[in-house]
Amino acid sequence: MARVTVQDTVEKIGNRFDLVLVSSRRARQLQTGGKDALVPEENDKPTVIALREIEEGLITKDLLDARERQEQQEQDAAELAAVSSITHNR
């Protein structure tokens, strides 16, 4: 397992504050959201996996934002379809 350095990951994100936000969002996705890792897990914890993904350029703030927007739109569409089917059945 290659060691992840903060400096390498900060260079990919821009600053250490955004790094904390992006890496924690991604780690939470990996741990609770049922998202698959984009790098081999190698028995690492979600936080380390998130940092490795950032270091390799696989995860960015814009990518996370786009994925969350897409998931929200899909959820909204499913809810709208469910409500429509209920109102049409009356």
From Swiss-Prot:
GO terms for cellular component: DNA-directed RNA polymerase complex. It holds the Pfam family RNA_pol_Rpb6. Keywords: DNA-directed RNA polymerase, Nucleotidyltransferase, Transcription, Transferase. Signal peptide: none annotated. It is an enzyme of class 2 (transferase). One of its GO terms (molecular function) is DNA binding. It catalyses: RNA(n) + a ribonucleoside 5'-triphosphate = RNA(n+1) + diphosphate. Residues 69-90 are annotated as: Disordered. Its EC number is 2.7.7.6. It comes from the Bacteria. GO terms for biological process: DNA-templated transcription. The keyword Lyase does not apply. Promotes RNA polymerase assembly. Latches the N- and C-terminal regions of the beta' subunit thereby facilitating its interaction with the beta and alpha subunits. Belongs to the RNA polymerase subunit omega family. The RNAP catalytic core consists of 2 alpha, 1 beta, 1 beta' and 1 omega subunit. When a sigma factor is associated with the core the holoenzyme is formed, which can initiate transcription. This is DNA-directed RNA polymerase subunit omega. It comes from Aliivibrio salmonicida (strain LFI1238). The gene is rpoZ.
